[in-house]
């Protein structure tokens, strides 16, 4: 799989990725982070077109350089920080890239919660280490949102597109999230 965000999507009057997002400027930044967080977690090789990492609102133009001056503004600097950190996170976590060419590296937990716009899936490496990915595609805080998990024990949030250092709301789920067998869901014996 190749997941391209090609130049053809951000030129010739089609708008930048930022301008394709709905909502306020803050919601546009959050939408791009959520979309690209999903892309990084999804199986397949990644291709990101230049300028997106800066949060450019203008279309890409081959006759001029990127709008590097945007990095002097806090929201754009935070967006740039997000891209740096998610790339490092991706490289450091082999379940995200080791088996990205077939179904052995991917499994759905929840793919049908269209009312909440949330999807949940698992990614695996060859040793069956795994990461659970939760994507919330709307700017609504999901308190007490439960997901089925494969193992009994403690879970922790290891990356979030909504962390304040990326310009997000700063809502964190933290660590030591204990699974509960009283609430089985999504075909799993426990949930968090």
Regions found by a protein language model. Give the residues of each.
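Conserved strand-to-loop "acid loop" that flanks and positions the catalytic carboxylate
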Residues: 5
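Active-site region of glycoside hydrolase catalytic domains
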Residues: 1-2
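Carbohydrate-interacting/catalytic domains
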Residues: 8, 13-14, 23-48, 52-192
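Juxtamembrane extracytosolic/periplasmic "stalk" immediately C-terminal to the first targeting helix
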Residues: 18-20
């Amino acid at each position: 799989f190749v997941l391209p965000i090609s130049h053809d999507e951000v030129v010739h009057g089609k708008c930048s990725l930022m301008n394709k997002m709905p909502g306020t400027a803050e919601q546009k930044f959050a939408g791009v982070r959520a979309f690209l967080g999903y892309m990084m977690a999804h199986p397949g090789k990644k291709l990101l077109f230049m300028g997106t990492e800066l949060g450019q609102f203008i279309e890409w133009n081959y006759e001029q350089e990127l709008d590097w001056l945007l990095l002097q503004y806090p929201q754009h600097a935070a967006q740039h920080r997000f891209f740096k950190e998610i790339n490092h996170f991706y490289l450091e976590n082999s379940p995200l890239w080791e088996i990205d060419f077939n179904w052995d590296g991917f499994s759905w937990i929840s793919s049908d919660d269209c009312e909440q716009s949330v999807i949940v899936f698992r990614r695996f490496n060859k040793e069956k280490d795994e990461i659970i990915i939760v994507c919330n595609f709307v700017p609504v805080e999901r308190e007490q949102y439960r997901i089925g998990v494969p193992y009994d024990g403690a879970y922790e949030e290891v990356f979030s597109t909504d962390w304040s250092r990326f310009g997000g709301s700063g809502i964190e789920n933290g660590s030591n999230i204990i699974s509960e067998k009283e609430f089985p869901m999504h075909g799993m014996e426990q949930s968090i």
